[in-house]
């Protein structure tokens, strides 16, 4: 998953036309601060930023560090900032940044491990905290299936599309100000299970989210939803959770 290169798919590329790729370089054992390093890479109309990075690693500088895996916008591994905007490296086409340069930086609001690789441990801790999985009452798995209607699935379908790419954390203006803010993706995934008819931990999860500033720190700017590559609306999930929590405080049965 880390630092792979696939030189065999780039051998037929000619250097007739190039574009400048400016990549953040940072070695914590040597550098006091991140710096940008420029590379002239081949330009092809069908290339994305990840292709250009793979070219650099395979042909110019094998020390460049970044994460990637599927190259298909599914795994969420290759999140980075491209010309200041949170993007998946496998979905950001070079043609959209002509004539260049294309400035590739690590995602904002995360500690840098090295070059484009960031430390995501805080996100993983927050994700575990909201319990994004189905919790049932029974002590053992019961017989049969837990069937759902199309209408029941549609309630949470959008939020289930999250791929944990963390672009929403890079875009969120609250995360750098309130580091303890649970954040968009974690709340969206919590909402996904809140709306799942098979789940039985709705009130427990809601108390977890509302018992601190987990949701109330959100200022509803909506940048998280704007940058999501899968069309998830974390801002909507946060507002829905706020509304449900408010009903629970004002009405004896949570508005039911």
Regions found by a protein language model. Give the residues of each.
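Ferredoxin-type iron-sulfur electron-transfer modules in oxidoreductases and energy-metabolism complexes
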Residues: 47-62, 105-256
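A cross-kingdom feature strongest in bacterial/archaeal respiratory oxidoreductases
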Residues: 41, 65-68
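Glycine-rich phosphate/adenylate-binding loop and adjacent beta-alpha elements
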Residues: 82-104
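Short, contiguous acidic and Ser/Thr-rich linear segments
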Residues: 36-48
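Eukaryote-biased recognition of intrinsically disordered, low-complexity regulatory segments
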Residues: 16-38
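Short, structured protein-protein interaction patches enriched in aromatics and acidic/basic residues
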Residues: 70-79
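Short, Lys/Arg-enriched N-terminal segments with co-localized hydrophobic residues
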Residues: 3-14
């Amino acid at each position: 998953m880390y630092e792979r290169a696939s030189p065999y798919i780039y051998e037929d590329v000619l250097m007739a036309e190039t574009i400048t790729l400016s990549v953040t370089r940072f070695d914590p054992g040597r550098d006091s601060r991140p710096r940008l390093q420029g590379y002239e890479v081949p330009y092809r109309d069908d290339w994305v930023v990840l292709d250009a990075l793979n070219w650099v690693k395979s042909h110019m500088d094998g020390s460049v560090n970044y994460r990637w895996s599927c190259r298909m916008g599914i795994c969420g591994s290759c999140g980075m900032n491209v010309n200041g905007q949170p993007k998946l490296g496998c979905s950001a086409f070079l043609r959209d940044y002509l004539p260049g340069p294309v400035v590739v930086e690590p995602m904002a609001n995360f500690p840098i491990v090295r070059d484009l690789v960031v430390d995501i441990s805080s996100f993983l801790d927050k994700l575990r905290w909201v319990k994004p999985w189905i919790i049932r009452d029974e002590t053992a798995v019961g017989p049969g299936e837990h069937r759902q209607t199309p209408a029941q699935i549609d309630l949470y379908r959008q939020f289930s599309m999250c791929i944990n790419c963390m672009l929403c954390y890079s875009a969120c203006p609250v995360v750098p100000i309130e580091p303890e803010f649970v954040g968009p993706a974690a709340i969206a995934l919590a909402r996904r299970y809140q709306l799942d008819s098979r789940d039985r931990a709705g009130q427990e999860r809601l108390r977890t989210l509302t018992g601190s500033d987990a949701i109330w720190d959100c200022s509803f700017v909506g940048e998280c939803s704007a940058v999501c590559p899968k069309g998830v609306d974390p801002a909507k999930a946060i507002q829905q959770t706020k509304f449900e929590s408010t009903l629970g405080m004002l009405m004896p049965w949570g508005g039911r």
